């Protein structure tokens, strides 16, 4: 039988409302007590494992059309949470601020999508008139231009 301590080591962490920060704080605190991966390669392995588990839940949720959707939504949420938590651990290992990384990627996505919109408008079309393949080609052009 497992007996829980009244006061967890993790309960000492302050709440700042930032979920990415909380994940990193939880992992950092656990690491102080030896609960950590010894190398970043193992974090990548764990991330691949978590992605595989998420993929498995996606397949199961699509196969079981007649059963409780709430159950599968909860499973998908749980597995996606594991992937995100692992990504925060990777950010900690790489010493990268995940908020800054995500903000940078959001900005990059906006620049590239704006390029696609301009590209499509120059052809006198609407974005929904192009296939995904055509949109991907425009995306690749945006990348080539350093956007």
Question: What is each residue range found by the language model?
Answer:
Residues 1-80, 85-147:
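Flexible "arm" and connector segments at domain edges
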């Amino acid at each position: 039988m497992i007996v829980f301590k009244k006061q967890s080591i993790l309960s000492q962490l302050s709440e700042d409302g930032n979920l990415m920060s909380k994940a990193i704080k939880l992992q950092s605190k656990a690491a102080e007590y030896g609960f950590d991966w010894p190398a970043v390669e193992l974090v990548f392995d764990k991330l691949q494992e978590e992605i595989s588990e998420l993929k498995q839940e996606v397949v199961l949720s699509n196969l079981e059309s007649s059963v409780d959707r709430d159950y599968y939504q909860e499973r998908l949420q749980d597995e996606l949470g594991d992937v995100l938590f692992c990504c925060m651990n990777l950010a900690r290992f790489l010493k990268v601020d995940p908020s800054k990384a995500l903000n940078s990627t959001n900005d990059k996505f906006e620049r590239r999508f704006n390029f696609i919109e301009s590209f499509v408008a120059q052809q006198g079309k609407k974005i929904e008139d192009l296939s995904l393949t055509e949109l991907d080609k425009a995306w690749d052009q945006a990348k080539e231009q350093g956007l």
